[in-house]
């Protein structure tokens, strides 16, 4: 399985082409639209989300509600493009129109300046448009297809926010996977403690009035993954490493950890390692899950626990100082439409990116020309693991 995305933030559309999806997977536009709608939700989103109502168009690889095994083409139209016809025109236009929305004051923390240097852009909009988080629309769309595969194999997942702009979420003890999932899904903030909703919303409103932004830490949990996915035999076969790369590829993500993560640096080995158990009904298990479901780059059969940290959005309504790329004089950075926070949306993106990596690993590990073939191979493997 592999995919490519294309498109700009204010261009005509966003596109993804996915190759390697088994034939016979039940797939409807509504499956993808559901995930796209989740990405657009959450408290703190800005005006762009009131303009766009993302709906996918499937133009290849699916017939009569089933995948055919051919490449799948997904497209989402940018409604906002109608206001940017001259600025984002494909053909050449008058110089005065080119200057209309030219970006020459790069934003600290964004790809504007370095992108312009790398690709020799006189107008930093050429970097801004593609580096925008709008691109993650298609990564969510691809992830929605991946989640359909995982669902057919009995794998489920959730995300929730652990730290929201410096506020630590108090997680009630002994919540089951399903309880965590339901609480997060029904929260505008993707948190599992409803008692903290108003406190955080008030803080977001305050940050918005200040023209500032906030980030936080998101946790994704995956249930139902058997032991043995990934490999220790080469560095690039380690599944946790693949997940780390994928999570860090999400716009504004600056760190990733598994299980208790960086807290391991403060603990002893006897406190960190997960003791092994075995029962006739369940096979091998662990007393704890400090390592987040991974040993030696392979899954252990425990829930996968992946955490990612998102920096505050770099576009500020009270912009920081920058430099004019023409005169090299100090200037305030360009202001583009932005949000005080996009943490709930980032959680949806992270969840779908993780789903894509896991689906790819499964498709590469098991015979998967068709879904029935994959389901049998996966079921046989589960049975083997249980009786090892």
Swiss-Prot record:
Homotetramer. This is Chorismate synthase. One of its GO terms (biological process) is chorismate biosynthetic process. It is an enzyme of class 4 (lyase). This reaction introduces a second double bond into the aromatic ring system. Reduced FMN (FMNH(2)). FMN binds at residues 130-132, 251-252, 296, 311-315, 337.
